[in-house]
A protein has these predicted regions:
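Extracytosolic ligand-binding ectodomains
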Residues: 1-451
């Protein structure tokens, strides 16, 4: 949430927001009320979030008048998607979830007698920061004021200045770089920043008895931030880290793998194989890294860990499943809350494309819904008005990914992490299974599968 920001809702809408996440689809009368200029109402929402070792109190005050001229026609929502490039394996599933949300939202609007529709305009960024900015500028030229995405922190960092300067509201489903946690800007993120994932990774690895880790990581906003967060948290536990940074555009990782292989060999002689590991902080190129690691005996004999860039990554199992299964590649990713909404979306995406969605399919679905509710709440298509009311809506919304409470920087206020591993199926193929769960409140790992 944003410091000092006042959020506008009518008294009828304020009451509705307390339950809107649970009753979407059964609130037809709400929109009729929202189309009539209401009296100004001030509401205050205070949420106390306990996240060991810190307890955070988040307060949002709403004092803006909603209403005015009734919205009509198509309301455009931009979507900066990784339909190709280094995160294409994620983009396909997220695009599917977004289309499901768009259809459901428009059915909701139709049933409630509204004169406007919610239109998603998808643009492929190819996971390239420069192209993401070009696509945002193109959307802005077409009058788009609200944008979903992009997927990567590198892209978000590159578009942030333009979005802030031009008052375009951007809500990312998956950007996690801690450096982008900035209060009172025009950027929200429906995931926690990587200070949380760094803590989860350090606990996961240290609890396995590992004291020395080679980190092979992508040299961009996301990779740099996550490597730093992990190294800081792991260092607190007495662990040693050797970071090896690579160019995000690289296709040959022999230099990095050779360095890692030598360091692992040195450590194994000094401390034993059980005390060393590799942490891979990569996107889809993790498949290439794993394939090329076949040439390095020390790396193949070592347990690997991954992150949200590899967890449930379809390219990893299709291109390098045998290597990933051998080294395990235990990968952390923000955990959705299991609920009927979660299960419904999971089955819908699976039926549409034959793949289970990952967490960011759930968060992008929730972004679409919360933006639709925000538009209806304010009664205007205006980024600043939506920005003001958005934290209160998220604080009272329970979606497919769970409760969407935000912190002072406009990012999700923490949560647990699922830990995924690659296994060989009875059919001889490879798949991801949830192997463990990291609980943030207790700072503990619970295993669901044999290690």
């Amino acid at each position: 949430m944003r410091n000092g920001k006042k959020l506008g809702v009518s008294s009828a809408v304020a009451a509705l927001l307390l339950v809107v996440g649970l009753v979407i689809g059964a609130v037809g009368g709400y929109f009729v009320t929202a189309s009539v200029p209401p009296a100004t109402t001030t509401i205050t929402t205070t949420q106390i979030v306990t996240q060991t070792p810190v307890t955070t109190t988040v307060t949002a005050t709403a004092t803006v008048t909603a209403g005015g001229a009734r919205l009509t026609g198509e309301i455009p929502i931009g979507a900066l998607m990784s339909l190709s490039g280094d995160l294409a394996s994620f983009g396909k599933r997220e695009s599917t979830a977004l289309k499901i949300a768009e259809k459901e939202i428009n059915e909701w609007l139709r049933q409630s007698g509204q004169a406007w529709t919610f239109r998603i305009i998808e643009e492929d960024t190819a996971t390239q920061p420069a192209l993401a900015l070009q696509k945002l500028q193109s959307l802005a030229a077409r009058g788009v004021k609200l944008v979903i995405g992009p997927l990567s922190s590198g892209e978000l960092r590159n578009i942030k200045g333009y979005a802030d300067s031009n008052r375009i509201l951007v809500v990312s489903q998956s950007s996690t770089a801690p450096a982008l946690a900035v209060p009172d800007d025009y950027v929200f993120r429906l995931v926690p920043d990587d200070n949380f994932q760094g803590k989860a990774l350090s606990k996961l690895i240290s609890s396995a008895g590992v004291s020395h880790v080679v980190v092979i990581y992508r040299g961009d906003a996301w990779g740099d931030g996550l490597q730093e967060a992990f190294a800081r948290e792991y260092g607190k536990l007495g662990g040693e880290v050797v970071p090896i940074r690579y160019n995000p555009d690289a296709k040959d990782f022999s230099a990095e793998l050779s360095t890692a292989n030598a360091k692992i060999g040195e450590w194994v002689k000094s401390y034993g194989a059980s005390k060393v590991a590799v942490l891979d902080i990569s996107f889809d190129e993790a498949a290439l890294i794993l394939l090329q690691a076949k040439d390095y005996a020390n790396l193949l004999a070592t347990r690997w860990y991954g992150t949200d860039g590899t967890a449930q990554n379809s390219r990893v199992i299709s291109d390098a499943g045998d290597v990933a299964e051998k080294v395990k590649l235990y990968s952390t990713i923000f955990a959705a809350t299991s609920s009927p909404k979660y299960e419904k979306l999971r089955s819908q995406v699976k039926a549409a494309i034959g793949e289970d969605p990952e967490i960011y399919s759930y968060t992008i679905y929730d972004i679409a819904w919360t933006l639709a509710i925000a538009i209806a709440t304010t009664g205007v298509y205006d980024a600043t008005a939506i920005k003001q009311v958005y934290p209160t809506i998220c604080a009272n919304y329970f979606g497919a990914s769970g409760w969407t409470l935000l912190n002072e920087a406009g990012d999700r206020a923490g949560g647990d992490y699922d830990i995924w591993a690659v296994v060989k199926t009875p059919q001889g193929t490879y798949d991801w299974v949830k192997a463990a769960v990291y609980n943030f409140a207790s700072d503990s790992v619970t295993w669901l599968q044999p290690t």
